[in-house]
Amino acid sequence: MSLFNKVVKEFKWGQHTVRMETGEIARQASGAVLVDVEDTVVLATVVGAKTAKPGQDFFPLTVDYIEKTYSAGKIPGGFFRREGRPSEGETLISRLIDRPLRPLFPEGFYNEVQVVIHVMSINPEVPADIPALIGASAALAVSGLPFNGPVGAARVAYINNEYVLNPTRSQIKGSRLDLVVAGTERAVLMVESEADQLPEDVMLGAVVFGHEQMQTAIDAIHELVREGGKAEWEWQAAPKNEALISRVNEIAYNELLSAYQTRDKQARSTKLKEVYAATQAKLEEEAAAAGTVAADKASVGNVLFDIEAKIVRSQILNGEPRIDGRDTRTVRPIEIRTGVLPRTHGSALFTRGETQALVVATLGTKGDEQIIDALEGEYRDRFMLHYNMPPFATGETGRVGSPKRREIGHGRLAKRALAACLPSAEEFGYSIRVVSEITESNGSSSMASVCGGCLALMDAGVPMKAHVAGIAMGLILEGNKFAVLTDILGDEDHLGDMDFKVAGTADGVTALQMDIKIQGITKEIMQVALAQAKEGRMHILGKMTSAVSGVNTELSAYAPRMITIKINPEKIRDVIGKGGSVIRALTEETGTTIDISDDGVVTIASTSSEGMAEAKKRIENITAEVEVGQVYEGTVLKLLDFGAIVNLLPGKDGLLHISEIANERIKDINDYLKEGQQVKVKVIQTDEKGRVRLSAKALLNEAAQTEPTPQQ
C-alpha cells in the first residue's frame, strides 16, 4: 500500500499541457498542489490556523512567491551562496497572487492564513506567475478552508489583431498587450496589464477572453477537489452584536453624517477621530453605569466603519455630491509646474486636489542600466521608475526605510504606463531613472506618478512619443444600482467596490489595473468604467498639453552628453587594454564614461564636450589601421644597428630601416636619430603579420620633386 493518496489532473490549456497533483508532497500543510506547465513547476502550499488570535480584528493573509535558483540550474551569487531577500519580481508576483485571493475569504474570518509558492523548475519560455496563481488557488480549494473560490487566471497577448492565450516569452516580446486576468466562474476579480496604446474595446475584449479561457483551469481544480480535497472546515462567522450596532448607530450616525459634509480631508479626518473617541467614551460610560463590560475598540471601530460606508455609498447612489463635493464624473483641480529642481535633469510637480507628486527624471549611460539576474537569464533594463510615499504625505508618522510591497507595486504600474511611449535605445541612447516622491496623498497617487513622470521626462529632454496620463476610477454597486466614480479619493477607495486604474495617451491605453472586491461586476459595468476613464484621461491630457506642449529641446546643463562611434570589434581589446588599463586611463584623464558593446559600438558620455572630443580622438587613434602610403608623425622608441623602431599610433609600431632614413649611406644611426625624437615617416609596406616598414627618405625625395626648378 502506498504512503500517498496522490491525485493527478491534466488538461490542455492554450498551447500548453497543465498537470496538477496533490497528496504526495507537503502533506502536513493544510493544502498543497504541484503544478507543471511544460517543465515550469511550482509547489503551492497553504496553512491556515485553526483559531483566530484573541482580539484579532482583521484578516492576516500573507502570500509569498519564492524563486529557487536551482529551478534554472544555477547557484545563487553572494558570499553565502543561498537565496536572500525577495527580488522586485518576486514581490510583484506575490501581490499579483494576493489580490484575487483576498476578497474571496468570508467576512469575519480572522484566522491566519499563509500561502507559499516555490518555483521548483523553470522553462525560460513559460513564465511562472500564472502556474503560481493557479497553484495557490488549487491549494486553497483542496485545503477545506472557508474560501469562495476557486480562482482561475490567464495571460492574454494581442498579436496580429488576435488574442493569444498564455503566450510564451518569445510571443510576449512581439505582442502589443501583456494582460493577466484572474477571477472566479462568475466574475473577474483582478486585471494587470501593459499595452501599446490599444483602444478600450480591445482591452475589454482581452479581459473577457481571458475570463472565458480560465474556466478550463477552474473546472480542473473542481475535479482535483472532488478526488483529493480535504473536508471543509466547520467555521461560522461570529454572530453580529445587533445591540451594539443599534446603539452605535444611535450615538454616532448623525455625527458621522455631519463629518462627511466636511470637504477638506484633514478637517474631516479630525472630526471622524473625534466621533470615534466620543462613541467609545459614551459606551464605556454606559457600561460602567450598568456594571457591564464595554465593547472593545476594534468591535466599535468596525461598526463605525460600516456606518461610514453606508453613508458615503448611499449618498453617491442617490445622486448627492461626493465626499469632496464633486459629481461622479469631475476630475479634481490640477496644477502643473516643471523645472522645479535646478540641478536635476528634469522635474515636475503634479498636483491633483489633495494628491501631489514631485517627480524627477535622471539620465545616465549604458553603465547605469539595471542588471537583473532573473531565473530566465540575466538582462539589462534601461528604464527604472521608483515610487516613494513617506508617512508625511498623509499627515502621519511612521517608518521610513526600504520600499514596501505597495510602493514597489505602484512604481511598476507607473513604469508600465510610461514604457510604451519611451523612445527606443537607438533613438535615445540614455538610461533613464524616474523617481516619484509622493508629497501629498488622497487617492490615486500612482496615477499622479504617471502624469508627473511623463512631464519630468519631457522636461529632461526625453523625446516621448506622446503625453501619458493616468486616472483612478471607483465603483459603488448595490443591487441593480451602480455609480462609477472618476478620480477617486482615498476614502472612496476604502469604502467602494472597485479600484480601477487606467493610463494612456490620446490614442489608447498603455496600462490597466483592476482590483474588484465583489463578484457582481459585469462586462457592461466595466465598459461604462472604461468609457468614463477615457473621458477623465482626455481631460487630464488637455491640462498637461496646455502646461507642457512638447519635449524640452535642450538637455539640462547637468545631464551627460553622448556621442557614439563604431570600431572594429577586433579592436575592442586594444581600447580596453590589459586588465582594463587603457580604458581606465582614458576615462580618468578625459573625465568621461565609456561603454563598449560587443558589436563595436562605443558610447562616450560626459558633461564636458572637450573631454568627449579628446576621448573620441584617442579611441580613433587606438583603433586606427596603419595604411600604406599614409604619412605619420612618429616617435622613435628604440635605435637598432640596422634601423629604428618608430611608434605611429597607440600600439602601432613600424621599422624605419637604416637604408630608408636618408639618401646618403649612413655609418652610424646615432648621427641621424635619437630615442624620443619626433620623425615624419611614410608607410611603404605592411604584411599579413601586421609588420610595418617605414621610410623617411621617400618623403625627402617627394619634397625634392615638388620644388620649383630655377628659370633659365
Curated annotation (Swiss-Prot):
Q: Where is the S1 motif domain?
A: 629-697
Q: Which residues bind Mg(2+)?
A: 493, 499
Cited Gene3D superfamilies: GHMP Kinase, N-terminal domain (3.30.230.70), K Homology domain, type 1 (3.30.1370.10), Nucleic acid-binding proteins (2.40.50.140)
Which cofactors does it use? Mg(2+)
A Pfam family the protein falls into: RNase_PH_C
The reactions it catalyses are: RNA(n+1) + phosphate = RNA(n) + a ribonucleoside 5'-diphosphate
Which locations, inside or outside the cell, does it occupy?
Cytoplasm
Query: Which HAMAP family does its entry note?
Result: PNPase
PANTHER family tied to this protein: POLYRIBONUCLEOTIDE NUCLEOTIDYLTRANSFERASE, POLYRIBONUCLEOTIDE NUCLEOTIDYLTRANSFERASE 1, MITOCHONDRIAL
The Swiss-Prot or TrEMBL record describes its family as follows:
Belongs to the polyribonucleotide nucleotidyltransferase family.
Q: Which NCBIfam families match?
A: polynuc_phos, PRK11824.1
Q: What name appears for this protein in its UniProt entry?
A: Polyribonucleotide nucleotidyltransferase
Taxonomic source organism: Paraburkholderia phymatum (strain DSM 17167 / CIP 108236 / LMG 21445 / STM815)
